[in-house]
Amino acid sequence: MGYRSDVRIMTTKKGFKELNKYVKDYLSKLNHDEYNLLDNLEFKAENDYAVYFGWNWLKWYDGYDSVDAIESGLNHLRDKDMSFRFARIGESYDDYEEDSYESENEEEQDLEYPSMNREFDDSYVIEEMERVS
């Protein structure tokens, strides 16, 4: 089954197009049909300025070509002075990772940061208690 994570990324619309192009080029250079995460988003919201997207319950491992393509693409956005926000929540309570870049270009500024809540799932615990009674 493996360890799973939830991932959220925020870019400008221009940044999303650049990331998409970069990831496609990155994966095509591997000379095999690799799964493109950007073609398989589980979550996407956008407005006139920004795109907020991500995946739930994903194997986000270094060394997976699809993951490396996204991470390399975010570094590419940084190199091109394009803002982004990245957050990953792992299964373990203390497993949280984030990265971001704020462009000096006014058109690329003021992106929201991903927001997360961790909370108790009381209904699950109560159901399990009732099940074993």
How does the language model describe each region?
Residues 1-27:
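Short, extreme N-terminal segment that most often corresponds to the first beta-strand
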Residues 23-133:
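Charged interaction segments
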